[in-house]
Amino acid sequence: MNKKEERASLIYHSKPKPGKIAVVPTKSYNSQRDLALAYSPGVAVPCKEIEKEENNVYKYTNKGNLVAVISNGTAVLGLGDIGPNASKPVMEGKGLLFKIFADIDVFDLSLIHI
């Protein structure tokens, strides 16, 4: 990659907002009622329904359309052992591909060894 394309890549990953993926609400949050339904006390109702019938988790949550992309950064896409923080752009890129090609939501996790 030439210097011009390297610079373009850095700008792409940092502007206007750093990263390539985000968590966005799927429900309204414009009122106190919306927030009460989204969290407490309203969230208890679907929790109880899931407790009664475990498969309800797919009815009331995003579980059926959510994956985790996890790396500790030790074997990254031809880059080798670059560490968890340096692997984050690759994990976000995988998340972006899942979203645009399959409409699957992703949480990317970069794990640090302790």
Task: Enumerate the predicted regions with their spans.
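Glycine- and acidic-residue-enriched helix-capping/strand-helix junction motifs
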Residues: 77-91
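Gly-rich Lys/Arg/Thr-decorated short loops/hinges at beta-loop-alpha junctions or inter-strand turns
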Residues: 30-31, 71-80, 98-108
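Conserved small/polar residues in nucleotide/adenosyl-binding loops
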Residues: 112-114
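A common structural microfeature
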Residues: 32, 44-47, 64-67, 73, ...
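Solvent-exposed alpha-helices and their adjacent loops that cap or buttress functional pockets
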Residues: 15, 57-63, 70, 99-100
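Extended, charged alpha/beta regions that create polyanion-binding interfaces
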Residues: 2-3, 13-20, 25-28, 90, ...
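Short, glycine/charged-enriched hinge/interface segments at domain edges or termini
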Residues: 51-66, 79, 92
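An N-cap/entry alpha-helix motif that binds or orients negatively charged groups
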Residues: 17-59
